[in-house]
Amino acid sequence: MANIPGYTYGSAAPSPVTMRELEELKQAVLFTAEDEKYLKMAGEVLKDQIEEVLDLWYGFVGSHPHLVYYFSGPDGKPDANYLAAVRKRFGQWILDTCHRPYDQAWLNYQHEIGLRHHRTKKNQTDRVQSVP
């Protein structure tokens, strides 16, 4: 497991979404074993380019005030430490999406990520004071 602060893959609480529901969702969006195969191939291409992908994404977020707002401190300015902490986990998420099996551990962590994007758990992982 990657040594990234706040990266809790494999130890996240159980997702309320069941594996059966995940399989039904995959069917509904036509996600197949072939998609998984190509994600693994993409992961091989991306593994040495993660920083470039993150630079592009952070440039996009940073160019939209309504997006960077969610990384702002009480002073209204982007919190560089918060952005850096999230960046490390986002890079690992890209690799996980490409290489990890879509099993219960994966599902649990995706649910955890969702909670961290909602006022339920936003700001807690990095102990920051940002907008909910």
What are the roles of these predicted feature ranges?
Residues 25, 50-132:
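Heme-based O2/NO sensor domains and their adjacent alpha-helical segments
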Residues 2-60:
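Intrinsically disordered, low-complexity terminal regulatory regions
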